Design a protein with these regions (language model features):
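N-terminal periplasmic/intermembrane-space "pro-region" immediately following the signal or transit peptide
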Residues: 1-164, 171, 398, 402, ...
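Short loop/turn motifs that connect adjacent beta-strands in outer-membrane beta-barrel proteins
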Residues: 76-105, 116-120, 155-168, 213-223, ...
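Outer membrane beta-barrel translocator domains of Type V secretion systems
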Residues: 97, 102, 110-149, 175-204, ...
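Membrane-embedded beta-strand positions of outer-membrane beta-barrel proteins
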Residues: 105-111, 168-172, 225-227, 261-263, ...
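Surface-exposed loop and membrane-interface regions of Gram-negative outer-membrane beta-barrel proteins
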Residues: 126-146, 155-222, 233-235, 335, ...
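Signature for the C-terminal beta-barrel architecture of outer-membrane proteins
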Residues: 219-221, 232-420, 482-484, 492, ...
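C-terminal structural cap/anchor segments
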Residues: 406-409, 413-525
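Outer-membrane beta-barrel "beta-signal"
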Residues: 532, 568-582
Length: 582
């Protein structure tokens, strides 16, 4: 049987309304025949909040001198002169006058205590122990040094976006040093001065005017000139020249800082002997350095910077002999016939620093060519032709960095052939293979002349046979060096960092050593340098940093042949350093 369709429901009969129908407010607003709809009423989320200003009242504004003082108007920060972390006029956080004239004050206390033991010759005229009959005496020494560095910088410009337009900087340094040794005629040429020395000095390490004379692009590429006593480093690791000389330097950038250049002339200043700081009370040396270099960022791959450099060193210090503050002759060095000499040398170099993927890489290559008017050993003029190469590769594994280091400096093959093939720098300060935590780099080991000529200089890696790294002249008749090293940097904790290095050292050629010591064949084995260091930052920041290190040189056969009378004690160097920064 067919199904019937469902019945349609019938509406209920309407009843007469008892009153007007209820209509929502929003429908009333929409049904208004004329005018704009009123804005919706926003309920108060927080009844205690401050009501917004009325649109019918005039706007109340308080003018302020500049945007840096907005925090003062809002009472967000109370400036304290001793607080370097919040807005502070002494730290260049806000203008001291005008709209963009700033002042920046930095104070650093650098304290060093350094016990060490190294081969030490006995005094020539006298000795601390009258019954001594050896060539070498007691080698224990210690030095305490305090440097108070005050940096004053007055500059104009908005440094957030571009370099300063003007900068005037002055950096005085107050130094105190105390040294004690076990043998006379080390701290002073006069043996009556004993075995201790207290000294102090006030130096000017920086005093220059910097002027940005041109902006060359919308990305603030610039040309700048700096005149006065200024810091300069020739390459990434300080292999060739790092100093605070007086001079003129033009520098700038192009192509959004991808190209950088330096063109400069510098004249080296005399140094205070016991502090190593500039002595502006003396006439500058007749030692000129002309530099031109060009940097390219993101060379070949992003993150690697390449530098090409040409340096001309013109040293014409032939007027007279020069004695240091302790009475020792440093120019010319007391070796050979010790007559005054001059030399002209050009360094052609290429340097790189950065990373290829996860591999951190730094490399340096130099070729030195020039002329020495008087070789002190052969007693005639000589041509300079020497090479230098260094590389360091490292990789990070989480909190651990593993490094490998290689350095080669050519050595002189024959001191009498009219050629100088031993590489020497102008004034080096290498940050390489452990740097100043290494015994070989940190300590100057005496060689001949009662210590008047050292095997290598203080904070130097090259065995240059110079009287003084700071006050002496370059010497290209030297044995050269081969260094192979490995190292580890470990970030143990946010406060703690540990560093360890092992470097194996060889001379490249010992002919110059044999000539100076009047000694037969000397082995190339120099020794093994082992060092460990730790850094502690109690507040996780760089304002308080404590560094400590210990290093030993395990003598090789060649070192033992040079210092056979120096006893069987292993040379060592210990360093404790506290740096406080404001």
């Amino acid at each position: 049987m067919a199904q019937q369709p469902p019945a349609t429901p019938q509406p209920e009969p309407a009843t007469a309304p008892s009153g007007p129908a209820s209509v929502p407010d929003d429908r009333i607003i929409q049904q208004r025949p004329m005018g704009k709809p009123l804005p919706p009423v926003i309920p108060l989320i927080d009844p205690s909040q401050v009501a917004p200003p009325s649109p019918l009242l005039p706007r109340e504004t308080v003018p302020i001198p500049d945007r840096w003082r907005l925090t003062d108007q809002l009472k967000l920060v109370n400036q304290r002169w001793f607080d370097p972390y919040n807005p502070n006029e002494l730290k260049g956080d806000r203008p001291i006058h005008g709209e963009d004239w700033f002042f920046n004050l930095s104070v650093v206390s650098d304290t060093v205590f350094e016990p060490r033991r190294l081969p030490t010759p006995i005094g020539a005229q006298s000795t601390q122990r009258p019954q001594s009959n050896d060539q070498f005496g007691y080698g224990k020494q210690s030095t305490f040094v305090e440097n108070l560095i005050v940096s004053l910088s007055y500059l104009k410009g908005d440094t957030t976006f571009k370099p300063p337009e003007y900068e005037f900087r002055l950096v005085p340094v107050i130094n105190y040093n105390y040294t004690t040794v076990k043998e006379v005629r080390l701290v002073n040429i006069d043996p009556r001065r004993g075995t201790t020395r207290r000294d102090g000095f006030v130096a000017i390490q920086e005093a220059f005017v910097d002027y940005e004379y041109r902006i060359v692009s919308e990305r603030y590429d610039f040309d700048d000139v700096r005149v006065g006593i200024q810091p300069f480093i020739s390459d990434f690791r300080g292999f060739l020249f790092q100093d605070q000389p007086i001079g003129v330097r033009f520098f700038g950038t192009r192509d959004n800082n991808q190209w950088q250049y330096n063109i400069g002339w510098f004249r080296r200043l005399e140094k205070d002997t016991n502090s190593g700081l500039n002595d502006i009370t003396r006439t500058p040396r007749h030692d000129d350095v002309f530099v031109g270099n060009l940097y390219r960022q993101d060379f070949m791959v992003p993150g690697f910077t390449m530098q090409g450099i040409v340096v001309y060193n013109r040293n014409h210090e032939t007027a007279q002999q020069f004695l240091d503050d302790n009475g020792f002759q440093v120019r010319p060095a007391i070796m050979g016939d010790a007559r005054p000499r001059s030399y002209d040398v050009v360094y052609l170099g290429a340097n790189g620093d950065g990373h290829f993927g996860r591999w951190n890489t730094t490399a340096s290559l130099y070729w030195a060519i020039g002329h020495d008017d008087h070789n002190q050993i052969s007693q005639r003029s000589a041509n300079i032709n020497a090479f230098f190469a260094a590389a360091e590769v490292s990789r990070d594994f989480d909190w651990l960095r593993v490094r490998g280091s290689l350095l080669y400096a050519s050595g002189d093959k024959d001191p009498y052939d009219g050629k100088e093939n031993g590489f020497d720098a102008i004034l080096e300060n290498p940050q390489f293979a452990g740097a100043d935590t290494s015994f070989w780099i940190r300590q100057a080991v005496p060689l001949i002349g009662g210590g008047g000529v050292a095997l290598s200089g203080r904070n130097a890696v090259l065995p240059a046979l110079r009287s003084s790294k700071d006050q002496g002249q370059s010497n290209f008749t030297n044995p050269g060096l081969l260094l192979v090293g490995i190292g580890v940097d470990a970030d143990l904790a946010p406060r703690w960092r540990a560093i360890a290095n092992v470097n194996q050292l060889w001379f490249n050629n010992t002919s110059s050593l044999s000539a100076l010591r009047n000694q037969g064949d000397i082995d190339r084995g120099l020794g093994t340098d082992v060092s460990v260091a730790v850094q502690y930052r109690p507040l996780f920041i760089q304002n308080i940093v404590f560094n400590a290190s210990a290093a030993v040189l395990i003598p090789g056969k060649g070192f033992k042949q040079l210092y056979v009378a120096g006893g069987s004690n292993t040379p060592y160097s210990i360093l404790a350093n506290l740096v406080l920064t404001y």
